[in-house]
Amino acid sequence: MLNKHYSLADGCSLTVICSLVVWMLVAVCQAVYGKDVYPKQAVEIAKKYITLSRDVKAQARAKGLRPAALAPYYIYNDAQDKGFVVVAGDDDMGDVLAYSTEGTLDTLQANPGVKLLLEAYRQTYDVLKEGRVMVQRKARSGLFSKTVSPLLKSKWGQSHPFNAQTGYPYSGCVATAVAQMMYYYQWPAQGSGKNEYRVTYYNTMKSADFSQSHYDWANMLPDYNYPVSATKEQEDAVALLMNDVGVASFMQYTPVLSGTQGIFANQALQKNFDYTAAYVTKAVEGPTRFAQILRQELLNGCPVYLEGRPAGNASGHAWVTDGFDENGLFHMNFGWDGQGDAYYSLTNLSLSQTGSEFQGKPLAFNRAIMAILAHPNNGKYPAIERGLLESSPQLMFNEGGAVLLKDAEDKSFLASQSLTIEMNSFVNKGKPFKGDVGIAVYDAKGTCRQVAYTDGHAIGGF
């Protein structure tokens, strides 16, 4: 937290008018508590998306409205295996948390990305029940007039043939997510630079000269699953790409899984594969802004890399979001040979308050999602928003940020009055710098009247 003291010049005054705005927001966004969703109600919601078997309907009727029948969410598979739907157990989470028009959802066999989201839904439900969180109804209602159908056509995974040139059992979820995005763009034709590092588990060195790699996009298939019979050239093409992405992002391989950090993938895209990229986190941007960024990228025709980590567990999963529907649910491609690919809710993981049990603090699952925005440098796509790039130095408040006028009454004060201002929870999203942070005071005409610096300005700031 920074404390700032300043005195305004004679003849200048500052009045912050906010009461009217606050009153209007209260009028249109009334906070209310959600209602439990029972199996019988959940079935009625599910019927709008899929065809249910008679047994499922009968079971729901039998459970009735007993409290013991309540659940954080209800999973229903289509009677003909033509999709599934996940219905929320509390209507403050929305009606539907996920749905697909193909395949089924088996929680025992679900990929890590699906399990991560389902666990996050469970945590959200628990917070709603234990903390009695108030949710803004207005914020979660309304339809989107523009939608984006899934951009990716690929259904890639981590085993054969994707791991064929890595020398290890799994290519890694980070490499699979990035490679699928690159396949969508068919870029670049050739890599650049080199990388070498140690694979810790095996205590061996792994390296690659990307300038020697020519990516055969035309020979890569969108789907290598049975009954597809790929040629050796088609398998080699995707295996080379997957290995290069893994090496460029310092992939750590083990017999049971392979993983790395998204920040390394972000750097690799720029350094080795000729992309402009931005690393964006939900914790810094805030849930509403984060979702807006994702939607705009998708509207621009650009899929987005996502990475999530469950609370209390360092191991996460990386995948791609490549579309969204009229209700704001995002389509996820989990890089698991198509398994679990569907529309999922991200917004219900965003709670503005968490109740007295959690001292009103955002929980881990609200902060644990980050994104990589990546655009090929081929001139075919709109530029990434400049303010999101690391090359655009800027300070910004994160979701808990605030500016407080400590000593002012009624948000106004005399021009000659010395005033203490406190700012907290802001971050530097750009390059590191050494300096100071100040506050500028503008009059009603937009003229800068005075600039005030921190108490430590005389000794060099921070």
PLM regions: where:
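Autoinhibitory propeptides
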Residues: 72-140
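Solvent-exposed serine/threonine-rich low-complexity stretches and specific carbohydrate-binding patches
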Residues: 438, 445-462
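Active-site-adjacent substructure of cysteine-protease-like catalytic cores
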Residues: 60-82, 267-333
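Bacterial N-terminal signal peptides
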Residues: 15-28
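Short, non-transmembrane alpha-helical segments in secretory-pathway proteins
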Residues: 33-67
